[in-house]
A protein has these predicted regions:
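Walker A (P-loop) phosphate-binding loop of ABC-type ATPase nucleotide-binding domains
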Residues: 37-41
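Helical segment within the ABC ATPase nucleotide-binding domain
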Residues: 169-182
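Hydrophobic anchor residue at the start of the ABC signature
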Residues: 144
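Conserved ABC transporter NBD signature motif
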Residues: 58-69, 73-74
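Catalytic Walker B motif of ABC-type/P-loop ATPase nucleotide-binding domains
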Residues: 155-158
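Conserved ABC ATPase "signature" region
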Residues: 98, 102, 109-126
């Protein structure tokens, strides 16, 4: 089954065409690496999938449901990691994930179990410090945990390894590979070796 289907999507900003008839489909429990140079339309595509950018023409479907600009109905299936995730720096990892789970309407017991499971997955299970002391790599890992919290069918990661050193990039890619058992992953990058 296709979790994501994009059909002939066209998007321009003024006279500049960014997406020219984009077609793709992503099957369940797969990892799809979206590669291109800066300005190639990777982030625009991801924002269109989330219903945050209006396409000039074409159609996008998540779990068989059409995505509409400005409506978030299909976002219940999606977890999203932006290229630079933002957090409430005064919180701990557990406080932050509890806050996010409450926003999603998750059951309190489920938030606790899921937070523990995900923090272990991303290597932050023993972390008790406030987020303000985190490195960029630690923030990326917490962002992945947050994006997976509500068990999305599709995890979208916008340049998850950008600005990380080689060891940090490998850690994030290993986490995404582990997360494939739980969800389908679409990630963008301009680094060819990340896709390989």
């Amino acid at each position: 089954m296709n979790v994501l289907t994009i059909q002939n999507v066209i998007k321009s900003f003024g006279s500049k065409k960014v997406l020219c008839g984009l077609e793709l489909s992503v099957q369940e429990h797969s990892i799809f690496g979206f590669i291109g140079k800066n300005g190639a339309g990777k982030t625009t595509t991801m924002k269109a999938i989330l219903g945050l950018t209006k396409c000039d023409s074409g159609a996008i479907y998540v779990m068989g449901e059409k995505v509409h600009f400005g409506q978030t109905n299909t976002n219940r299936y999606i977890g999203y990691l932006p290229d630079v995730p933002e957090f409430y720096s005064y919180m701990t990892t557990t406080e932050y994930l509890t806050f996010c789970g409450n926003i999603c309407g998750m059951d309190k017991a489920d938030i606790t179990v899921r937070s523990t499971e995900l923090l272990k997955l991303v290597g932050l299970g023993q972390e008790k410090r406030r987020i303000k002391g985190f490195s960029r790599g630690m923030k990326q890992r917490l962002g992945i945990a947050q994006a997976l919290l509500n068990r999305p069918k599709l995890l979208i990661c916008d340049e998850p390894t950008s600005a990380l050193d080689p060891a940090g990039r490998k850690e994030i890619l290993d986490i995404l590979l582990s997360a494939k058992e739980q969800t389908t992953i679409l990630f963008s990058t301009h680094i060819l070796s990340d896709v390989e």
